[in-house]
A protein has these predicted regions:
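Short amphipathic alpha-helical segments embedded in low-complexity Lys/Glu-rich regions
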Residues: 26-29, 38-46, 114, 191-193, ...
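Conserved P-loop NTPase motor cores
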Residues: 66-68, 77-102, 106-113, 117-234
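C-terminal recognition-helix end and immediately following basic linker
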Residues: 1-5, 17-48
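Pre-Walker A adenine-sensing motif
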Residues: 57-74
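Short cysteine-rich clusters marking metal-coordination/redox-active sites
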Residues: 9-11, 59
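Intrinsically disordered, low-complexity regulatory regions of eukaryotic transcription factors
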Residues: 46-59
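Conserved GTP-binding G-domain of TRAFAC-class P-loop NTPases and closely related GTPase folds
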Residues: 200-281
Length: 281
């Protein structure tokens, strides 16, 4: 269980897997009476009944009600930005998403176009293992012809400078995404990359996956002030918790149809214990 009881507990036993152990821990370590333990146990009961977990790492974060699977599925067509420095885990995260594409998206994906700047041998493994994926070097000149009216995903890896300066990229994100049924996924090294169309691309991005970036934590702070102007502390606490482990990340779900209660998540893949950060109102 991911919930911490209470915030300042340094005892590993504070992370409990059943109500009996949690109750004993609160009584013996935190010296809580039966009445004092009751709200913690009531809160924990929600988690043990459901396969989705919510992290309540700070006093201003509280548990959310059980989630419906469709609530946390990526809504296609959409635009996704995966951000972080070299070796942070962006490429691995993207590959894992594509390998679980049927479970991760709201629609059946028929074609994946994977565009890269530098060839890597693992691209051959992806073409062998992932159905209907096509690898292309460089930024494609005619994007729509590659999909032939199929429901698809355009992935751009190590093409930050090219993609943010191309008119065709803006057309895909602002018009093609909706009218051509194409989702875009692009990997960048900072949240606000330079480029002719970077601001337009950023404003039309529905999901931002932010990895740990020791040299650019200001970028997350700016994003927090833009998307959550009255809750920047909540966002930064969530981000710091999500990236505390190697290759950790925080998903900013900014899709218009997403519930306000589940906009910050981590560990989102089918074999993970998904975590949702919820603000105390």
């Amino acid at each position: 269980m991911l919930t911490r009881y209470p915030k300042d507990c340094s005892v590993p036993g504070c992370l409990k897997t059943n109500l009996v152990k949690l109750s004993n821990h609160l009584a013996n370590v935190h010296f809580m009476s039966k009445e004092e333990r009751k709200p913690y146990l009531q809160e924990a009961r929600l988690f043990f009944k459901e396969y989705k977990n919510v992290n309540t790492l700070e006093s201003n974060l509280v548990p959310h009600q059980p989630l419906n699977v469709m609530e946390v599925t990526l809504k296609h067509p959409t635009n996704i930005q995966v951000c972080g420095p070299t070796f942070c885990g962006k490429s691995y995260w993207t590959e894992k998403l594509l390998r679980n594409v049927d479970e991760m998206f709201s629609e059946k994906i028929e074609k994946i176009v994977y565009c890269y700047g530098e060839f890597q041998p693992r691209f051959l493994d992806m073409e062998r293992d992932i159905h209907n994926i096509q690898s292309i070097e460089g930024f494609p000149e005619d994007i729509y012809s590659l999909f032939n009216n199929k429901v698809g995903i355009l992935v751009l890896v190590d093409l930050m400078n090219e993609s943010t300066s191309k008119d065709s990229m803006v057309n895909v994100i602002t018009r093609g995404c909706h009218h051509r049924n194409i989702s875009t996924l692009f990997l960048v090294q900072n949240l606000f990359p330079p480029g002719k169309h970077s601001r337009t691309i950023s404003l039309n991005t529905h999901y931002i996956v932010a990895f740990k970036h020791p040299r650019d934590s200001l970028g997350v702070s700016i994003l927090a002030r833009q998307a959550f102007p009255n809750a920047t502390k909540y966002v930064m606490e969530s981000y710091e918790d999500a990236v505390q482990n190697p290759y950790g990340y925080l998903v900013f779900d900014l899709h218009p149809s997403t519930s306000e209660k589940i906009r910050l998540r981590t560990s989102i893949f089918p074999d993970d214990q998904q975590v949702v950060y919820v603000r105390r109102i």
